[in-house]
Amino acid sequence: MKILVIGGPTAIGKSDLACCVAQKLNGEIISADSMAVYKFMDIGTAKPLECMKKVPHHLIDVVEPGGYFDAKIFEEMAKEKIEEIKRKGKVPIVVGGTYLYIQALLYGIDETPKPDWNLRNKLYEIARKKGNDYLYEKLKAIDPKYAKKIHKNDLRRIVRALEVFINTGKPFSSFHSWNKPKMDFVGIYLKRSPESLYKRIENRVYDMVKDGLLEEVKKLLEMGYENFLTSGQAIDYKEFVPCAKGEKSLEECIKEAIKNTKKQAKRQIRWFRKQGWHEIDLDKLSIEEACEEVVRIYKDANKTK
């Protein structure tokens, strides 16, 4: 049985479609979202809370905010879940926009060195004194391939890549096998026109604020998670920290969140477009029609294995 992978940019409609597909295929969903792994962060990560009542979901609420979780850990945990789901006679459906996680699962990551906390803390201290850009430029010089794949403010990933290079002399990208897939899978890429997607992103940010995102950010700050919330990774959270602290207006924070989410979507689109997966245009099909099409593609692929 092949696994089904449904990917695409943020706010495209992955969760709604995956929920429909999972019910029709008797599947279970494995989330490939680098923010959904964190507990207490429901609104800003758009966790599919309604669908979670109907379909079993995995790799959501795994660690506390700021807890260590990377693509290698995701690969190992996702593989375990895939085997567990298959043993039940159900279809494993991987859903998300974090392409580094999807890439790790499908193509594998060689064993990377264990964390060196002393070195890591020194690198964080350098970033505190000299800024994220300073470390990002260092990473670009030693590992341009990996630097291209991550955001210049994603300090956690920058520090990890530098840490590995300093300890091994090898670029972090050399631990990734990006040639032949190690898993038998059917890939579905969801797309929309830029105008349509950007409108959905704008609406989603406003909806999240309406649903209580600012209150969620305030609660997380009270719990002591400010360092994580202001990291480059925490899109739709970091933008609202100044607002929660009374340093910016709500409208300013909303505009910043929309701008950063659109940038993230562009990076995701660039990666998914290159994969050669089956493309589903959600501007032309309703969720129900797209669901039927994905089910057909998946069943046909399993007939010809």
UniProtKB/Swiss-Prot annotation:
For this protein, what is the EC number? 2.5.1.75
Spell out the residue ranges making up region: Interaction with substrate tRNA.
33-36
GO MF terms held by the record = ATP binding; tRNA dimethylallyltransferase activity
Q: Where does ATP bind?
A: G8, P9, T10, A11, I12, G13, K14, S15
The annotated site for Interaction with substrate tRNA falls at T98, R120
Its cofactor is: Mg(2+)
Q: Where does substrate bind?
A: T10, A11, I12, G13, K14, S15
Establish whether keyword Transferase is in the entry. Answer: yes
Q: Which InterPro entries match?
A: Dimethylallyltransferase, IPT, P-loop_NTPase
The UniProt entry's GO biological process terms, in alphabetical order, are: tRNA modification
Q: Does this entry carry the keyword Magnesium?
A: yes
Arranged from A to Z, the UniProt key words for this protein are: ATP-binding, Magnesium, Nucleotide-binding, Transferase, tRNA processing
Which family is it part of? Belongs to the IPP transferase family.
Protein role: Catalyzes the transfer of a dimethylallyl group onto the adenine at position 37 in tRNAs that read codons beginning with uridine, leading to the formation of N6-(dimethylallyl)adenosine (i(6)A).
Specify the protein name.
tRNA dimethylallyltransferase
Native species of this protein?
Aquifex aeolicus (strain VF5)
